[in-house]
């Protein structure tokens, strides 16, 4: 992805967060130059990949297959120094965009429609013996205190304010209808590592390759300099 594209997406994201009065921690407004002055007291941000994250899953087609997100808080499954057992993210999805089909081996999460248009989900049970197989079995849904079953791959609509619980080995994809508005999406989950706990149905990259065509407006969570 071109840096100019990433910069524009982050600015869009900031505008949407302001529109819905979702305030962010101070570190999310630091410039690249400010990051160069930060010492080890901010290692939790670096070590746990808190911050901005814009991805096209390595396919170069962000408008249809992409996601913008911010990890606001997280623990670290690989480092006992960080004892948080929970994580929080806020995401933005544009109309026509899909977050591609995947499951988590360990993470349980709630996805919340925080405002904008509708989110459309499709879920399948994964075959634990053959993880690349989508089972044709009914999927148990837990949504805002209600439990019920749907057919595999059946569409589930989340309107603003509604949420959906996703359990390990639940294949899930979600998208925003083309005639909708951008959607602000919350995630409350167990502590997790996106590098090791995403099983995509079709092999995909997690982070983009960045083409530097202009200076960075905000650093991505994979780009922080070493502590001074």
Where in this protein do the model-derived segments appear?
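A short, N-terminal "cap"/entry segment at the start of jelly-roll beta-barrel domains
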Residues: 1-87, 216-219, 223
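Double-stranded beta-helix
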Residues: 2-3, 128-148, 175-228
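Short, conserved secondary-structure segments in the cores of folded domains
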Residues: 89, 109-110, 154, 162
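Conserved metal-binding segment of the jelly-roll/cupin
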Residues: 94, 152-179, 185-190
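Glycine- and acidic-residue-biased ligand/ion/polar-headgroup-sensing regions
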Residues: 94-95, 107-109, 113-129, 133-137
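A short beta-strand motif that forms part of the nucleic acid-binding face
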Residues: 105, 115, 125-127, 170, ...
């Amino acid at each position: 992805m071109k840096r100019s594209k990433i910069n524009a997406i982050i600015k869009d994201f900031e505008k949407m967060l302001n529109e819905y009065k979702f305030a962010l921690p101070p570190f999310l407004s630091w410039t690249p130059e400010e990051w160069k002055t930060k010492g080890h007291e901010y290692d939790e941000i670096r070590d746990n990949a808190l911050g901005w994250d814009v991805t096209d899953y390595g396919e170069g087609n962000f408008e249809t297959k992409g996601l913008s997100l911010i990890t606001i808080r997280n623990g670290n499954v690989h480092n006992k120094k960080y004892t948080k057992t929970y994580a929080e993210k806020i995401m933005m999805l544009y109309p026509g965009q899909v977050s591609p089909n995947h499951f988590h081996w360990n993470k349980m999460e709630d996805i919340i429609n925080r405002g904008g248009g509708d989110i459309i989900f499709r879920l399948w049970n994964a075959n634990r013996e053959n993880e690349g197989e989508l089972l044709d079995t009914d999927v148990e849904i837990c949504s805002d205190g209600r439990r019920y079953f749907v057919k595999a791959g059946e569409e589930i609509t989340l309107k603003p304010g509604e949420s959906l619980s996703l359990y390990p080995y639940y294949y899930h994809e979600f998208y925003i209808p083309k005639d909708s508005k951008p959607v602000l999406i919350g995630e409350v989950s167990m502590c997790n590592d996106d590098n090791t706990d995403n099983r995509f149905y079709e092999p995909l990259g997690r982070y983009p390759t960045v083409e530097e065509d202009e200076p960075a407006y905000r650093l991505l969570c994979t780009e922080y300099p070493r502590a001074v």
